[in-house]
Amino acid sequence: MTRYSCGMSDSALPNPLKDKNLLLSLGLIIFIQLGISSIIPILPLMSDELGLSLGKVSLVVAAYTMPSIFLTPFAGYLADRFGRKEILIPSLLFYSITGTGCALAPSFSMLIWLRLLQGISVATFGVLFSTIIGDLYSGKERVRNMGYITTTFSACTAVIPLAGGLLALIHWRLPFALPIFGFVYANLAFKHLYVPNPNHTPDTRSYLANIKKSLFLHHGLILYSITLLASAGSFGAYQIYMPKLVNVAFSGSPAQIGSILTLSALVSGVISTQLVAINTLFSKRSMLLASFILYIISMGMMPFAGTYWGLAIPMALSGLAQGMSYSTILMFLSEASSAAQRGSIMAINASMLTLGQSIAPYILLLPYMAGGTAWAFITAASIMAGCVWLALRLPQTHRQ
């Protein structure tokens, strides 16, 4: 049952902390991030302990993320065909089993295989949290709750790396054991998560035809292209070349890199909680345009920061941009899709997000080799300019 809240004021919206469906849906983001954010800080330690190069050890991250690129659309189809909860619970159990197995893997090759299997289950998480929220809420409540998606991602980015680093002080295998909590979460979701399944699911041929029609009618291709370009530009700039800038230009430590990333995550988290208020003043298209312009300004400022503390302003601007952009794209897609199609629509968008992050290092590598981090940031800003061009081709929406 969808809640209709178009006429509610901000103060009349239900308390999100008392909404079990919302909390359980957002909890999926934590499990997605556990497999990345808790592992990245321990890669140098793993390299030393196992006597392997950092590049080879990084395969534990690639093995986890790659399945999502190819399998997320299929997971969305299954969620539309058989039901959200029917796909979620088995995926959670498989995730927990393979994740716990990673902590006990007797060899590096076995660890990679288990991470690959774990990544298969994560492909379903990437679509289900946004699909379920799109199913359950509408109007201002949907706007607010889509904003909480970015808030949760930001909180995970700020907290989980610290947790992984602290556990690694005891033993490098311990961060891999965190998915064991998925068993508890699966039990809670089984008992308390209410998800209305689509009333009608057509046969496969009709289903794919409807999806194709929906894409062109509701500017889906533009939104997918925006997701791909924005994720490539922002991930490459802030997750890959910002740390290089801090390390090379300012002799920054890993702790300083983490601190400046946390600043961006905190700003993103705060702004994403205010999306309802922002959407009462500006349309969704205007919010997207503003976020990409903020990205361009931020990326243009990065090479000229001068000092480590000079990075604070551009990184805060990147947080503002991130807090508005991703959730706004999800709102566009959710409103443009029916319940029977929403899983697949969100799945394709999630695949574009993962693909953008995967190709980011290669897109910015040549500019970096030619002119250092400055050229990498300029190239990333150019990518965001492309997002502005695409966003201008979206229909003007009403404020809510």
Predicted features along the sequence, with ranges:
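Paired small-residue
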Residues: 94, 98-101, 109-117, 309-317
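Helix-loop-helix hairpin linking two adjacent transmembrane segments in secondary transporters
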Residues: 148-191
